[in-house]
């Protein structure tokens, strides 16, 4: 069965895994999902991920979740732009998540990056999700 929102599915798996106190979760592999996970690693929200071959030609990403003193590092992770409603933001209109304590993940012409990196690069794009 094809997913209508693969990034939203991965974010939901991460959210559910952290609420269930899992050490890792699995999600189908894709380049865009890996790019989003790279941003989460750079910003310190997950420990890491690895690509695992489940069957011949089918790969999944094992996402290692991160906890601080037994509590999930990710308190909130939510999809902003969906396939039915794309949300784009110019750099000057990019809102801060929880007054700068959280991040937004953007898909820009220069690649997938956090809102901090987008401000430094002076580039806007599609707001994929927000993390706190």
Swiss-Prot record:
Disulfide bonds: none annotated. GO terms for molecular function: rRNA binding; structural constituent of ribosome. Gene3D superfamilies: 3.30.1370.30, 3.30.1490.10. It comes from the Bacteria. It holds the Pfam family Ribosomal_S8. InterPro entries: Ribosomal_uS8, Ribosomal_uS8_CS, Ribosomal_uS8_sf. GO terms for biological process: translation. Keywords: Ribonucleoprotein, Ribosomal protein, RNA-binding, rRNA-binding. GO terms for cellular component: ribonucleoprotein complex; ribosome. NCBIfam families: PRK00136.1 (NF001109). Belongs to the universal ribosomal protein uS8 family. One of the primary rRNA binding proteins, it binds directly to 16S rRNA central domain where it helps coordinate assembly of the platform of the 30S subunit. HAMAP family: Ribosomal_uS8_B. Part of the 30S ribosomal subunit. Contacts proteins S5 and S12. This is Small ribosomal subunit protein uS8.
